C-alpha cells in the first residue's frame, strides 16, 4: 500500500501538469490548429519509447506471491482446489469495484475544469489542481498510516465514506461552492487502489497472475463511467450529473465492509 501510494503521488501530480505543458508548447492557445498538436504528442511518444527501452533493459526480478507456484499449496490452501479465477467471488467483486473506482476517480480528476467553465468561474483551468491536491493528500496519509495505524480495509471504508460525502456535497450545495467538494470526492478516491488491490488479490495462490490481469482490465471503467456521466449531463445538467458518483462510492463501501470477505468452499 505504501509503494502504491508513492507511485500514486507521481501519477496524480501529472494531471494538472499536463495542461501546463501543453500551454508551454502551444504558444497561441486562442487559435489552436491540428498541426499544433503534433509536437506535444511527438514529445510524449518519445518519452514513452525511452521509458519502454529503460524498462526492457532494467534487471527487474521476477516477483512471485505466496502460493503462486502450481505445486505449492501449503502457502495458499484456499486456491488449491480451484480451477478458475471465476471461483474467487472476492476477486470478481474486486474487479467490478475497481472498474467503478477508476471511473469515479477519472470523473473527479477530469471534470473539474469543465464544471468550472459551466459555472462561468474565472480561470477555470486552475481548478484542475483541486482534485489532484485531494488525491496527493490522501496518498500521503496512506504512506504514514498504512499499515501501522490503518488496515487496508479500514482505509477503503474511510475513503468510501469521504467519497459519499463529497458526492452529496457536489449535488446539494450551491453550485459556486459545490465545485470545492470535488476535493472531497478526489480525497475519497486516493487510497482506493492501494487498499483495493491487496484485498482483491488475497488468497489467489496459483491464480495470482490471472487475477492481476483481470483487475488490470477493470481499468476500462475510466472510459465507461465518464461516458455515462456525459450522457447524464445532457439531461441533469453539469451539477446534477454528479449523482452518478453516489452509487459508485456506495458499492465501493460495500466491498470494503463485506465484499472482500466473501469466499467459497
Language model segments and positions:
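Intracellular juxtamembrane helix-capping segments at the cytosolic ends
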Residues: 1, 190-205
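Helix-loop-helix hairpin linking two adjacent transmembrane segments in secondary transporters
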Residues: 2-60
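A membrane-interface helix-boundary motif in multi-pass transporters
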Residues: 24-45, 154, 228-249
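Helix-to-loop junctions at the C-terminal end of transmembrane segments
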Residues: 26, 138-152, 233
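Multi-pass alpha-helical transporter architecture, strongest
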Residues: 50-59, 246-265
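Juxtamembrane intracellular "pre-TM" segments in multi-pass secondary transporters
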Residues: 65-94
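Extracytoplasmic gate region of multi-pass secondary transporters
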Residues: 83-129, 135
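C-terminal transmembrane helical hairpin of 12-TM major facilitator-type secondary transporters
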Residues: 151-196
